[in-house]
C-alpha cells in the first residue's frame, strides 16, 4: 500500500515542503543534475573541508551521484542539507554577507533572501527534515513535477 503524499508549494520562493516523497524519488527524478554540493550541515562527515566558507563540499558529478544514492539509504534521523553549485572557483568569490546567508539558510532551514545565488548558479537547496519530510527549493519549479508524477502519482495507478 502506498503512503499518502502531502505537498505545500510556495511558488513565490519556489519551495516545496512535502511528506511521502523520499530522497530516492528526488534523486531518480532530477533533470538538472548537480555538479557539486556545498553541505550546509557543519557536522557532516561527508565531503572535503573548504576553508573559505568553513563548510564541506562534494566535488564532481560522480561523487555527487554517489552522495545522492547514499542519501536515499540514510535513516530519517540523519541531517542532510545541501546547496548545489556549478564552479568550485566561485566558492572562493563568495562575500562574507553571502556566506552568512548560507549559514543562516543551513541553520534555520529557511531563506532570508533568495536561496538562489548568482555566484553559485544553484538549482536546488535540499533539506531532509526527518519523519519523511523534505523542504526543497527549486530554481525551476517544474522540476518538482518531474519528480512527483513519474515516481509517485503514476505509481498510485499501477499494481506492484
Regions found by a protein language model. Name each.
Residues 1-160:
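Structured alpha/beta or helical-core interaction and ligand-binding surfaces enriched in interleaved
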Amino acid at each position: 500500500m502506498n503512503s499518502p503524499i502531502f505537498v505545500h508549494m510556495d511558488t513565490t520562493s519556489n519551495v516545496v515542503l512535502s511528506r511521502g516523497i523520499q530522497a530516492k524519488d528526488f534523486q531518480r527524478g532530477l533533470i538538472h543534475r548537480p555538479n557539486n554540493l556545498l553541505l550546509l550541515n557543519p557536522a557532516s562527515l561527508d565531503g572535503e573541508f573548504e576553508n573559505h566558507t568553513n563548510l564541506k563540499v562534494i566535488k564532481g558529478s560522480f561523487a555527487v551521484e554517489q552522495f545522492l544514492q547514499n542519501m536515499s539509504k540514510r535513516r530519517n534521523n540523519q541531517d542532510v542539507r545541501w546547496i548545489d553549485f556549478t564552479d568550485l572557483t566561485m566558492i572562493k568569490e563568495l562575500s562574507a554577507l553571502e556566506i552568512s546567508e548560507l549559514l543562516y539558510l543551513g541553520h534555520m532551514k529557511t531563506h532570508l533572501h533568495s536561496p538562489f545565488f548568482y555566484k553559485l548558479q544553484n538549482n536546488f537547496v535540499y533539506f531532509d527534515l526527518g519523519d519523511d519530510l523534505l523542504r526543497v527549493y527549486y530554481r525551476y519549479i517544474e522540476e518538482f513535477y518531474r519528480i512527483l508524477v513519474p515516481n509517485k502519482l503514476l505509481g498510485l495507478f499501477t499494481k506492484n
